[in-house]
């Protein structure tokens, strides 16, 4: 790497790295470092009246206070931080004091990984700490971390720019302790859900992510190509149709937690790659599934937070079951004043126009109703609410309502103004299913690129017979947002999808060389901030000369400095 691409701190750290090796200390040792304790456990288990406990810990050095022959550092491991007391004579018991005077005080930097062996004690200030007897270098960091300072529980100099945090999540996790807590809770959400399903006897399964037909949801898929089979394949938008095939095959209850992919927009609640859970249970209906779902979410919230109440933004959301139930058409009537019951497509289109909605000719009856609900109703449901009994046109995989043939036995759970769950009494009539698929194809021909494609193999599976079944899907990322009180999906994804990083435009060395500039001086000029030839056009030659000669001296490049007249000659050659 060109030294001009490095900061001053990075150069110092690389020099320290080389000096460690020259001393015979490998800064990246291969051997296992055995630990027997974590910071939080040491603090929780400490007792003043017991024999000092011997411990071996490892982690990042996050702060250091050197006071001559004694020092304090703060060590951060995977669970938290603990103070370590280090003295020269303890870690250097013989005549050679290099480990303290040279390695610890000068060659180690904040962010380096070290191992500490010693015993636990309480300082005169009352802080539980480790008295170090041995220090081991485990990994040298050559790029400095942003150091967040804490005083009286308040953080200063925080690493908080959202784009930087999401792009460099590894730094975010290293310096912002509260971020790690979000992902620990995310893991608890998953384990609590699995525990709930497994306790009922339902089996976790895996179904294909690469599919020949993108089915199970109304969404735009990612498309790829399988070279060996010379055929298009689709990244999974839902696992529904494969899971139902397993119910046909004889499993009574199956679920899958896995990645889905939708080639659509990104915003505060959508990422093109997301995690979804879908579960299907034979011999159940959507009424049973509503009760099953609310009990599951109540359990998860208790397991993760110790309470059923969570603060999300300005709202306190209570996940204690049971939840309110409202039919979709009743909700629309309540929030718009229009009763859509019995209306045909043209009548609903007129309602949309009266409501000043933006609609187009590709939208069928179901899409129009969905747009009305989304614009006027969805955002009003803050507390958990089941929206039930969706119109038939909106739900091609759902069983017809037992008491109204225009509706289906479907519900969505709304929380904090957004959909969280989607569930049905599953359609198991193969003839009806084929007709619904054919209706979807008509919508596709009208231009609806989210309409479902006919999956003939799935229809064939239904022809062999599928028992009455209820299914439910839940967005795990949105569930985690709610359980951790986060307002954006990016906060609960380790590595959210990002736009490409902006790269500073630079002219090629050849363009600078056309002005008579030596190739060796091009990176120096660009280091000074003149990335394009045109950047030098209006610059005073003396200033440019001073800038580049200063860099030559600072970085000890030992290049022969040009004269001011030579620099002026470069600038004079720049064309208008």
UniProtKB/Swiss-Prot annotation:
<comment type="similarity">
    <text>Belongs to the class-II aminoacyl-tRNA synthetase family.</text>
</comment>
<dbReference type="InterPro" id="IPR002313">
    <property type="entry name" value="Lys-tRNA-ligase_II"/>
</dbReference>
<dbReference type="GO" id="GO:0000049">
    <property type="term" value="F:tRNA binding"/>
</dbReference>
<keyword id="KW-0460">Magnesium</keyword>
<keyword id="KW-0067">ATP-binding</keyword>
<dbReference type="InterPro" id="IPR045864">
    <property type="entry name" value="aa-tRNA-synth_II/BPL/LPL"/>
</dbReference>
<keyword id="KW-0648">Protein biosynthesis</keyword>
<dbReference type="Pfam" id="PF00152">
    <property type="entry name" value="tRNA-synt_2"/>
</dbReference>
<dbReference type="GO" id="GO:0005524">
    <property type="term" value="F:ATP binding"/>
</dbReference>
<dbReference type="InterPro" id="IPR012340">
    <property type="entry name" value="NA-bd_OB-fold"/>
</dbReference>
<keyword id="KW-0963">Cytoplasm</keyword>
<dbReference type="Pfam" id="PF01336">
    <property type="entry name" value="tRNA_anti-codon"/>
</dbReference>
<keyword id="KW-0030">Aminoacyl-tRNA synthetase</keyword>
<keyword id="KW-0436">Ligase</keyword>
<dbReference type="InterPro" id="IPR004364">
    <property type="entry name" value="Aa-tRNA-synt_II"/>
</dbReference>
<feature type="binding site">
    <location>
        <position position="412"/>
    </location>
    <ligand>
        <name>Mg(2+) 1</name>
    </ligand>
</feature>
<feature type="binding site">
    <location>
        <position position="419"/>
    </location>
    <ligand>
        <name>Mg(2+) 2</name>
    </ligand>
</feature>
<comment type="subunit">
    <text>Homodimer.</text>
</comment>
<dbReference type="GO" id="GO:0000287">
    <property type="term" value="F:magnesium ion binding"/>
</dbReference>
<dbReference type="GO" id="GO:0004824">
    <property type="term" value="F:lysine-tRNA ligase activity"/>
</dbReference>
<dbReference type="InterPro" id="IPR004365">
    <property type="entry name" value="NA-bd_OB_tRNA"/>
</dbReference>
<dbReference type="InterPro" id="IPR018149">
    <property type="entry name" value="Lys-tRNA-synth_II_C"/>
</dbReference>
<feature type="binding site">
    <location>
        <position position="419"/>
    </location>
    <ligand>
        <name>Mg(2+) 1</name>
    </ligand>
</feature>
<dbReference type="InterPro" id="IPR044136">
    <property type="entry name" value="Lys-tRNA-ligase_II_N"/>
</dbReference>
<dbReference type="GO" id="GO:0006430">
    <property type="term" value="P:lysyl-tRNA aminoacylation"/>
</dbReference>
<keyword id="KW-0547">Nucleotide-binding</keyword>
<dbReference type="GO" id="GO:0005829">
    <property type="term" value="C:cytosol"/>
</dbReference>
<protein>
    <recommendedName>
        <fullName>Lysine--tRNA ligase</fullName>
        <ecNumber>6.1.1.6</ecNumber>
    </recommendedName>
</protein>
<dbReference type="InterPro" id="IPR006195">
    <property type="entry name" value="aa-tRNA-synth_II"/>
</dbReference>
<keyword id="KW-0479">Metal-binding</keyword>
């Amino acid at each position: 790497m060109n030294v001009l691409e490095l900061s001053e701190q990075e150069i110092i750290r690389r020099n320290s790295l080389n000096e460690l090796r020259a001393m015979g200390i490998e800064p990246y040792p291969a051997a296992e470092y055995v630990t027997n304790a974590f910071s939080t456990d040491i603090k929780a288990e400490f007792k003043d009246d017991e024999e000092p406990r011997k411990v071996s810990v490892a982690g990042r050095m996050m702060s250091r206070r050197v006071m001559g022959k004694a020092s304090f550092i703060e060590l951060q491991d995977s669970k938290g931080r603990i103070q370590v007391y280090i003295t020269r004579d303890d870690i250097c018991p013989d005549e050679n004091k290099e480990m303290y005077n040279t390695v610890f005080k000068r060659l180690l930097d904040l962010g380096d990984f070290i191992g500490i062996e010693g015993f636990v004690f309480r300082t005169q200030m009352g802080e539980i700490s480790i008295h170090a007897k041995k220090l081991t270098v485990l990994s040298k960091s050559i790029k400095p971390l942003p150091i967040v300072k804490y005083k009286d529980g308040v953080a200063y100099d925080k690493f908080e720019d959202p784009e930087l945090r999401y792009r460099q999540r590894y730094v975010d996790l290293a310096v912002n302790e509260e971020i790690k807590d979000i992902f620990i809770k995310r893991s608890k959400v998953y384990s609590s859900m699995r525990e709930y399903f497994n306790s009922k006897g339902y089996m976790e399964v895996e179904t294909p992510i690469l599919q020949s037909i993108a089915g199970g949801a109304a969404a735009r898929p990612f498309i790829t190509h399988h070279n060996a089979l010379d055929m298009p394949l689709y990244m999974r938008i839902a696992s529904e149709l494969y899971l139902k095939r397993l119910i046909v095959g004889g499993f009574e209850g199956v679920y899958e937690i896995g990645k889905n992919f939708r080639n659509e927009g990104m915003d505060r609640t959508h990422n093109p790659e997301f995690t979804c859970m879908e579960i299907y249970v034979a011999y159940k209906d959507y009424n049973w599934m509503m009760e099953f779902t609310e009990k599951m979410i109540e359990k998860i919230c208790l397991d993760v937070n110790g309470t059923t109440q969570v603060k999300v933004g300005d709202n306190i959301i209570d996940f204690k079951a049971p939840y309110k139930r409202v039919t979709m058409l009743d909700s629309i009537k309540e929030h718009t004043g229009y009763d859509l019951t019995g209306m045909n497509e043209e009548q609903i289109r007129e309602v949309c126009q009266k409501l000043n909605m933006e609609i187009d000719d590709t939208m069928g009856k179901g899409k129009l109703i969905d747009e009305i609900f989304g614009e006027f109703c969805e955002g009003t449901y803050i507390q958990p609410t089941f929206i039930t009994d969706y119109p038939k046109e909106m739900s091609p995989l759902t069983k017809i309502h037992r008491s109204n043939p225009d509706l289906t036995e479907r519900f969505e759970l709304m929380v904090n103004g957004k959909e969280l769950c989607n569930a049905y009494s599953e359609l198991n009539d193969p003839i009806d299913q084929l007709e619904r698929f054919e209706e979807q194809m008509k919508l596709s021909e009208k231009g609806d690129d989210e309409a479902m494609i006919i999956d003939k193999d799935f229809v064939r599976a239904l022809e062999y017979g599928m028992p009455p079944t209820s299914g439910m899907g839940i967005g795990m990322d949105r569930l985690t947002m709610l359980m951790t009180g986060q307002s954006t999906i990016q906060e609960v994804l380790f590595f959210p999808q990002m736009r490409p990083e902006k790269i500073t435009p630079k002219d090629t060395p050849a363009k600078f060389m056309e002005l008579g500039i030596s190739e060796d001086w091009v990176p120096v000029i660009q280091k000074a901030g003149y990335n394009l030839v045109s950047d030098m056009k209006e610059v005073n030659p003396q200033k440019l000369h001073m800038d580049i000669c200063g860099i030559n001296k600072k970085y000890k490049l030992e290049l022969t400095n040009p004269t001011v007249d030579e620099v002026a000659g470069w600038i004079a050659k720049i064309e208008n």
